[in-house]
Amino acid sequence: MDDDKPFQPKNISKMAELFMECEEEELEPWQKKVEETQDEDDDELIFVGEISSSKPAISNILNRGHSSSSSKGIKSEPHSPGIPEIFRTASQRCRDPPSNPVAASPRFHLVSKSSQSSVTVENASKPDFTKNSQVGSDNSSILLFDSTQESLPPSQDIPAIFREGMKNTSYVLKHPSTSKVNSVTPKKPKTSEDVPQINPSTSLPLIGSPPVTSSQVMLSKGTNTSSPYDAGADYLRACPKCNVQFNLLDPLKYHMKHCCPDMITKFLGVIVKSERPCDEDKTDSETGKLIMLVNEFYYGRHEGVTEKEPKTYTTFKCFSCSKVLKNNIRFMNHMKHHLELEKQNNESWENHTTCQHCYRQYPTPFQLQCHIESTHTPHEFSTICKICELSFETEHILLQHMKDTHKPGEMPYVCQVCQFRSSTFSDVEAHFRAAHENTKNLLCPFCLKVSKMATPYMNHYMKHQKKGVHRCPKCRLQFLTSKEKAEHKAQHRTFIKPKELEGLPPGAKVTIRASLGPLQSKLPTAPFGCAPGTSFLQVTPPTSQNTTARNPRKSNASRSKTSKLHATTSTASKVNTSKPRGRIAKSKAKPSYKQKRQRNRKNKMSLALKNIRCRRGIHKCIECHSKIKDFASHFSIYIHCSFCKYNTNCNKAFVNHMMSSHSNHPGKRFCIFKKHSGTLRGITLVCLKCDFLADSSGLDRMAKHLSQRKTHTCQVIIENVSKSTSTSEPTTGCSLK
């Protein structure tokens, strides 16, 4: 056999069928080929591989006498660095010519077992020198370099065997030697390297000592390097407060919402950054895909002018209450307080259906409450659009909304003072309060218009409370004129192209995900190992590198000279539709337990009301005293009051409850019982200790009378009042104290 090619594999394509052979005239006894052995189990096939040198100089290793010299090695002649051609990938064979093998290469045995999932390193002199580690994935393998090999110069590479496609395998590396362990730990493999190099200055102690490290090279299919997250291994994460461990990220999120909600944002942000695969931001060489999150693709932030504005320390006077405020930020807060007071004084239906955060109006107070609980929360969910400040039921619906409505790098919220831009309204508001404090500038929270005078600012502020404002359909801003709205529409474009899209080749696909989700490599058909049920968006970048992206659904794309991003949506759940989705839990992809319970109750109640059989005649609601024409439409929804424990299915009764119980001005309360007030005239309250009497209109006076006189008691007399007579014999009575 030639010296240039001392290794001849029988089959490289299959992992378990790699068998190494070599022919040497003079071999040491321990260098002779070990015969294949087979255990009692028929499924445990053992394949033995050998790598030997062309010179018997490796036998000098046996001359070591002291165990303390574990980091020493024999001196060998310098050899040209390189990797045997058999171990090179296809790309390496094209770039570099074949090189000579490394002298005194390690000898190891590869054992493939289908019934175990451990990696073992054995030494003949130390039978207990073993280390077990869990195999991360079915499609990955672990290669441990033998710890009894000699030290090599730093420029030399250790040949490694790349194996793919093996399931439930483990490798046992054996080295029958009588000497102590002289270990060499290779450097951690980089992304751009295929074979790790040796660091001769480091050594591997025995397994019995605490600081044990093993030189492992994780080799997975399709990538040069991989991590335990790529391999699909369960990585335990602990709650920072109670130290309860979880295998998946979503159960940890659900636990932290109830255990430590104040720590969830910061703690999960660190976990996502640390667990994100290193190759997720890079284009795959084979498929040409790029994986990006919604936050990276659509959202952005631009600092604008960095020069500091001079402070004027101007005072502002409110012409409504003649109060003088020290600076502009306090005056803005004062105006917001005036707005809240005016809403409380004005008893209108809009006050109970308008969101106090984004100033949107909803048909019912229940829908408003659902919007606040799902969108304006301190926790970030993967189903919320930060530009619109709206929440969606699933991540797939969110991605469809982002594709149809927004552009990559869209920043519609602009500070008119310094041109600071952001995709979220809260960033601009926080920037204005921090950077432009103690100046003449006053920011409108409705349209972000900046004024420098108090009186025009207050007039502009109050005009937003009137009807007929022009709302932007793509964000939360609202304007007083259609001209301002048209000028604002120009901001809904790509302001800064994401850095990840720069330099992409034509035809490269970009996968947009709403969240990372639990990565599972057991689904090779899903892009980049995304979990079933995880929604993603595939975007093909334009051939020309332009900074503006156009939506393909817009018919007026000819107005812009830039090209478009053609987007197609798909879901990874189509890959594995037969498997249940019970284990995969998403933060907001599924409705909350409370909403799901209310939905089920509503569906059951609606079905029962539709199928109800009642007697003919007039039916009245005992809560609102109105006629019931259709039971299903009258009791359409189950409403729970957010201020007290009041629950009802009657929408009219809930409106009256909000007006009468949670209003600051009882004299202006709106009552829906005016049509039926005649039936309430039969109620009389009599004090049993004195001559104090009160009818149905004097209930508050009777309550005040009883509260001032602790020993007095009251009796309620209810009379049946007909339409013709106003009084009759008392029918029922009860006493109150």
Curated annotation (Swiss-Prot):
Polar residues composition bias: residue spans:
57-66, 112-123, 176-185, 211-223, 535-579
Q: Which Pfam families match?
A: DUF4195, zf-C2H2_Z280C_D, zf-POGZ
- InterPro entries per the UniProt record, alphabetical: DUF4195, Snail/Krueppel_Znf, Znf_C2H2_sf, Znf_C2H2_type
Specify the cross-link site (Glycyl lysine isopeptide (Lys-Gly) (interchain with G-Cter in SUMO2)).
5, 10, 14, 33, 55, 75, 113, 126, 167, 174, 180, 187, 273, 522, 564, 574
- SMART domains documented for this protein: ZnF_C2H2
Give GO MF terms, alphabetically: DNA-binding transcription factor activity, RNA polymerase II-specific; RNA polymerase II cis-regulatory region sequence-specific DNA binding; zinc ion binding
Where it sits in the cell: the answer is: Nucleus
Which keywords, in A-to-Z order, does the entry hold?
DNA-binding, Isopeptide bond, Metal-binding, Nucleus, Phosphoprotein, Repeat, Transcription, Transcription regulation, Ubl conjugation, Zinc, Zinc-finger
- Residues in C2H2-type zinc fingers run 316-338, 353-376, 383-406, 413-436, 470-492
Annotated region (Disordered) at: 57-137, 176-223, 535-602
SUPFAM superfamilies assigned to the protein according to its UniProt record, in alphabetical order:
beta-beta-alpha zinc fingers (SSF57667)
Q: Which residues carry this modification: Phosphoserine?
A: 80, 227
Q: List modified residues, type Phosphothreonine.
A: 223, 540
Provide ranges: composition bias, Basic residues. Answer: 580-602
What Gene Ontology terms describe where this protein resides (cellular component)?
A: nucleus
* GO BP annotation list: regulation of DNA-templated transcription
- Residue ranges annotated as coiled coil are none
* Function noted in UniProt: May function as a transcription factor.
What name is this protein filed under?
A: Zinc finger protein 280C
Species of origin: Homo sapiens (Human)
Query: What is this protein's gene name?
Result: ZNF280C
